[in-house]
Amino acid sequence: APDADKEYIKRVIAFEGEKVEYIADQLFIDGEPYTEAYLDEFKKDLAKETYFTEDFSFLVPKGGLFVLGDNRPISKDSRVFGAISEESITANAKFIFWPPSKIGAVK
């Protein structure tokens, strides 16, 4: 991450050797579409023809993990700082605070 002294909460999206792409607001991993139902709450207020996630393509290097934040328009994640190492993961999320409709323990 860009600030080594800060902790970030991100989703691991892809592993080494996998190709991650976003095309027209759809996530693809190795060419296969992947549904991100957890983003529905964020996307519902977007204007038609507006994308929540800009298009990109990334091949995860050896030993790397590709991570994305849920608030895609402003998230600092692998699109900004590249792949991360597994060793940089320090914990797992246990509780959801946002959006309010989803508050509770992670299932």
Predicted regions and their residues:
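Soluble "head" domains of membrane/secretory-pathway proteins
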Residues: 1-107
